[in-house]
Design a protein with these regions (language model features):
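Conserved N-terminal phosphate-binding loop of PLP-dependent enzymes in the Aspartate aminotransferase
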Residues: 1-411
Length: 411
């Protein structure tokens, strides 16, 4: 493929040009098939070209493609909101739509500032919230996401996130919470802090589930100070961790929840969920967007939710996640370069002691195993597993076999 007219700003982890995809597989223009465990960076939740999603999009395109919500409402907006209300944790019952994770995260911050009349936001080390100017300022997983764009917006403060590699996790959680407390004493007073925004499982930061004591400690502090708790479920939501949202593992109800990626099986769509009384504090007309709540995206999201509503769907996510982690742990016994295996559902991270080894394994898996994997983490030492959630037992076995071969070949 000639790329002479494409921007050079995109970074690619493979040189592949894809002609089609089905389920967990993609086929290149050269006719080669690859097992896709990148899934559009955890986006293709129901796999490539799921027939129900494809039909929903095609059927909607025959009715109308775009109906701008500031001009008139279309007939899928409310049905989707009702479905999301049924799925969302706690009393979340009101929804705003956008196109991407970064947009919806920025919307969450705007709502939090208007609702609380406070100017500041707290994020955490290792976080990723997007690539707009505001969300870059909120992103701390890698300098490459921020470099060359200063000055970034002010009013963003970074608190420590517990390291999963610390030997004593109780001590590590206490250290991180003390760091948060210190931040509220030294840099952003509680009455100036609108919100805390947290990924329940760090995404780009290395697929690190938040320790329960840490996330509960944060929520307790937020409640005590009137600080809104925003759950960034852009990557961890819609079944990725084995529950519809990762906060369900912790029994938590966020004030605001950010949804994107897997919500529409690959169609650009995002949603913000909150309680009606919070949403009512958002000044009418102070936020919006041309394509937010677009009819095609709503159709894709409704079809995705229908697929995920089958109890067998999440049961498969949990079973395949257990199979995947068990297989990696078995290989860990033979290869001490793997320092940790962690994750929830099909959001699994494999930590290595050497970033160069991770890159070599990715390369071998792609070229010899026809398996697409991506890395994560500040130092690039985490190999992340994020297959489509429809992956089956045989496909997990194929991926593990390719990974095992790569471990041996790169030793």
């Amino acid at each position: 493929m000639s790329e002479s007219h494409l921007s050079n700003v995109w970074f690619s982890v493979t040189p592949l040009e894809v002609a089609s995809g089905h389920g967990c597989w993609v086929t290149t223009t050269g006719g080669e098939e690859y097992l896709d465990f990148a899934a559009g960076i955890a986006v293709n939740s129901t796999g490539h070209a799921h027939p129900k999603v494809a039909k929903a999009i095609a059927d909607q395109a025959q009715r109308f493609i775009h109906a701008q919500v500031n001009v008139f409402k279309h007939d899928l907006l409310e049905p989707l909101a009702a479905k999301l209300a049924d799925l969302s944790p706690g009393a979340i019952d009101t929804f705003f739509y956008a196109n991407s994770g970064a947009e919806i995260t920025e919307a969450a911050v705007k709502l939090a500032k208007q609702a609380t009349k406070r100017p500041h936001v707290v994020v955490f080390s290792g976080s990723f919230h997007g690539r707009t100017h505001l969300t870059m300022a909120m992103t701390t997983s890698k300098t490459s996401y921020r470099a060359g764009h200063a000055p970034l917006p002010a009013g963003i403060f970074v608190a420590p996130y517990p390291s999963p590699l610390a030997e004593d996790q109780d001590v590590e959680v206490a250290r991180a919470l003390q760091g948060f407390d210190h931040l509220l004493k030294s840099m952003t007073a509680p009455d100036e802090t609108a919100a805390v925004i947290l990924e329940p499982v760090l995404g780009e930061g290395g697929y690190i589930p938040a320790p329960p004591a840490f996330i509960h400690g944060l929520v307790e502090r937020c409640r005590a100070h009137g600080i809104l708790f925003i759950a960034d479920e852009v990557q961890s939501g819609f079944g990725r961790t084995g529950t519809m949202f990762a906060v369900e593992h912790y029994g938590l109800e966020p004030d605001i929840i950010c949804m994107a990626k897997g919500i529409a099986s690959g169609f650009p769509f995002a949603a913000l969920g909150t309680r009606r009384e919070l949403d009512d504090k958002w000044t009418k007309g102070s936020h919006g967007g041309t394509y937010g709540g677009n009819a095609m995206g709503c159709a894709a999201a409704l079809a995705t939710i229908e697929i995920m509503s089958d109890p067998a769907f999440l049961a498969n996510v949990n079973a395949r996640g257990e199979q995947l982690q068990a297989g990696i742990r078995e290989l860990q016994r033979e290869h001490d370069v793997i320092t940790q295996v962690r994750g929830l559902g099909l959001m699994v991270g494999t930590e290595f002691s050497d970033a160069a080894r991770v890159a070599a394994i990715q390369k071998h898996c792609l070229e010899e195993g026809r398996l697409i994997l991506m890395n994560a983490g500040t130092y690039g030492t985490c190999l992340r597993w994020m297959p489509p959630l429809v992956v089956n037992e045989a496909e997990i076995d194929l991926a593990l076999a390719a990974f095992a071969a790569a471990l041996k070949a790169t030793a």
